[in-house]
């Protein structure tokens, strides 16, 4: 543990990033404060440290470091449209604020205001964590994001990817039309996941 603490406290962003990646695979709740402090320091660096901030945010979400909630909420409120840090914060915010894997209240709260990146991250949490919202919440989410990200330019990933993956474990009658709609868009990764979700099969996500 001392080695990880030293890396988190290092002045080198590469060291901090190494520690954050380690903590995504080796949970250490006792390092919550140090991870948050590391994120705050990295936020004061220039924009080149965005990769490290993303890894720290991923670490926060996976370890369920709830003390970081205000930091994540701040990023979500800024709601930057095309920003990887914001996407990571969206996923982590779902994780630290939910009571269990049926709780999508944070997503519902931001459904009508979230931009591309925030929405991308929040919807990813549904699929990567195989969340199980109520049928009512499923209907609400699908109706709200039916065409979410439709007009994004080339080179951007489809933000509904995580949602499409989550549909594999949901009531088929609630998701069938949505999945067929996603297949029809022609996006190759989404089409692959949607076809498997129609069969009730979870796939390995990117």
Label each PLM-derived region with a short phrase.
Residues 42-49, 77-87:
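Short, flexible, glycine-rich and Lys/Arg-enriched loop motifs at helix boundaries
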Residues 1-7, 27-44, 65-78, 98-112, ...:
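Amphipathic alpha-helical scaffolding segments comprising HEAT/armadillo-like alpha-solenoid repeats
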Residues 14-29, 50-65, 83-99, 117-133, ...:
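Structural detector for internal amphipathic alpha-helices that build alpha-solenoid repeat scaffolds
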Residues 10, 185-189:
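Short coil/turn segments at helix-helix junctions and helix-capping linkers
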Residues 1-11, 18-23:
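Flexible inter-repeat linkers and adjacent short helices
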């Amino acid at each position: 543990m001392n080695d990880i603490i030293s890396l988190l406290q290092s002045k080198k962003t590469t060291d901090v990033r190494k520690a954050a990646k380690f903590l995504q695979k080796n949970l250490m709740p006792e390092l919550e404060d140090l991870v948050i402090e590391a994120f705050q320091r990295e936020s004061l660096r220039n924009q080149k440290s965005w990769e490290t901030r993303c890894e720290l945010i991923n670490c926060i979400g996976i370890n369920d470091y709830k003390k970081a909630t205000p930091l994540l909420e701040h990023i979500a409120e800024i709601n930057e449209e095309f920003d990887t840090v914001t996407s990571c914060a969206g996923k982590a915010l779902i994780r630290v604020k939910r009571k269990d894997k049926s709780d999508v209240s944070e997503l519902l709260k931001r459904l009508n205001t979230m931009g591309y990146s925030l929405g991308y991250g929040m919807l990813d949490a549904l699929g990567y964590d195989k969340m199980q919202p109520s049928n009512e919440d499923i209907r609400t989410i699908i109706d709200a994001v039916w065409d979410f990200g439709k007009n994004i330019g080339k080179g951007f990933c489809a933000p509904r990817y995580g949602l499409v993956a989550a549909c594999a474990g949901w009531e088929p009658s609630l998701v069938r039309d949505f999945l067929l709609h996603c297949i029809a868009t022609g996006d190759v990764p989404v089409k692959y996941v949607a076809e498997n979700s129609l069969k009730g099969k979870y796939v390995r996500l990117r």
